[in-house]
Regions:
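ATP-binding/phosphotransfer module of carbohydrate and carboxylate kinases, centering on a glycine-rich
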Residues: 1-81, 85-115, 161, 186, ...
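Short beta-strand segments
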Residues: 55, 118-122, 173, 197-204, ...
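Active-site nucleophile and cofactor-binding loops and adjacent substrate-binding regions
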Residues: 56, 143-148, 169-178, 198-201, ...
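Short beta-strand scaffold segments in enzyme catalytic cores
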Residues: 61-66, 178-182, 198-200, 205-211
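Short glycine-enriched loops at secondary-structure junctions
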Residues: 67-69, 119-126
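Glycine-rich phosphate-binding loop and adjoining helix at the ATP-binding site
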Residues: 82-100, 125-197, 215-223, 227-234, ...
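Short, internal active-site loops enriched in acidic
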Residues: 122-127, 176-179, 341-344, 373-376
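Acidic, glycine-rich loop-and-beta core segments that form the ion-binding/anion-interacting portion
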Residues: 210-262
Length: 387
């Protein structure tokens, strides 16, 4: 036995512990679950206007000109995309190169008028009152020098301005928050109230939630006009019980041992490394999670079984995470605005999440919404236009 199969009781224990960790993060800084305030309310769905958007995730960086209108929007230019330079091999990247490469994706766009900038940045960062954010740590194996504990929006804005773009305002937000905002702009329904969860499960994983400001004890509510706020949980840093010695080995060999334990057990970047710890040399772990899907569906014997167990455990842990967050919400229908290459790329994944949610929280209806491909870009535009 490799310890990858989790019982319903173990999943309930994980969900309950996550609920506790989220409550601690809402109350105080420096907790395992960061619960980073965004100073953004849910959009009404009626926003309109144009914004320049840059979206940098764990795999790709892209730029677009976005035009929003009521409950919809489109890309007027782009997205222009390229692989994120990551510094995973060889020397770490310089910050100038990292941000300059992202700004280059906007080079073909017109520069006929100033536009607000929405920067979707999928790494842990603390929002600041001026719309920027301070990088807390790198995740997903990224290595960039000279950026930790510094603002990330300002250097991108400077690189864009060097290339002739006039920026009228700035808002930095996490990809999970952007996905949530964009999804609500497109799909908001009265039956959900404020019960929305943003979920990213691809190269990395994270959740975003919506909470009454009075629950955010660490936020000065006098400086924020709305009654509720979107919160970037940074849930990938949760340390769940019932992980295995193989998970411990992957963690110890990573560039951030002791952190992002949930992400390392669930997300697309790390699952092949866990497989490699169990069956060394069978696959190249850098080939990605699709290799595990192929092995499960087309392979044979112990290797196929382990690949299937890892993918199923990932989906069941993701469901435990959703149930743990939803336990802090009012009773009622809850929309999960899901995005990510693993979440939708494995044909069995979402159904496993649904089935596990029914086991964990049979009284609550979870509606899993498949997001549009451009939802992060629309969400970043929502944030930029909220200034």
């Amino acid at each position: 036995m490799n310890g990858l199969e989790l019982s319903l009781e173990q999943l309930r224990e994980i969900a309950d512990l996550l609920s506790q960790r989220i409550s601690q993060g809402l109350a105080r800084d420096g907790q395992e679950i960061g619960c980073l305030p965004t100073y953004l309310a849910l959009p009404s769905g009626k926003q309109s206007g144009k914004a320049l958007v840059v979206d940098t995730g764990g795999t790709n960086t892209r730029a677009a000109l976005v035009n929003l209108w009521s409950h919809d929007g489109k890309l007027e230019a782009g997205p222009n995309a390229r692989k994120v330079p990551d510094g995973r091999e060889g020397a770490p990247l310089s910050a100038d190169f990292f941000f300059g490469t992202q700004a280059e994706q906007a080079d073909p766009f017109p520069r006929d008028r100033p536009l607000p900038l929405g920067y979707c940045f999928s790494y842990p960062a603390q929002a600041t009152a001026d719309g920027d954010a301070i990088l807390l740590r790198w995740t997903k194996g990224l290595r960039v020098d000279g950026a930790l504990n510094e603002k990330v929006g300002k250097p991108l804005q400077e690189q864009l301005e060097k290339r002739g773009h006039a920026i009228s305002g700035l808002r930095v937000l996490n990809d999970t928050v952007a996905s949530l905002l964009g999804g609500v702009h497109l799909y908001a329904e009265p039956r959900y109230g404020q019960n929305y969860i943003g979920l990213i499960l691809g190269t990395g994983t994270n959740m975003a939630g919506v909470f009454p400001v009075k629950q955010l004890e660490k936020v000065d509510s006098g400086a924020y006009p709305s009654k509720s706020m979107v919160v970037n949980l940074e849930s990938g840093n949760f340390s769940p019980p019932h992980l295995t010695a193989y998970d411990d080995a992957v963690d110890a060999a990573s560039n951030n041992p002791g952190f992002q334990r949930f992400e390392k057990a669930v997300s697309g970047h790390y699952l092949p490394y866990v497989f490699n710890a169990i069956h060394p040399g069978v696959i190249n772990p850098e080939a990605g999670t699709q290799k595990l899907v192929e092995l499960r569906d087309q392979g044979q014997g112990e290797h196929a079984r382990t690949a299937g167990q890892l993918l199923e455990r990932s989906a069941r842990l993701a469901a435990a995470g959703l149930a743990g967050l939803a336990a802090l919400y009012p009773a009622g229908d809850t929309a999960v605005l899901g995005e990510g290459s693993l979440f939708w790329g494995d044909p069995r994944f979402v159904e496993t999440v649904r089935a596990t949610l029914k086991e964990l929280d049979p009284e609550r209806h979870f509606e899993i919404v498949k997001q549009r491909d451009d939802v992060n870009l629309l969400g970043a535009a929502c944030a930029a236009l909220a200034n």
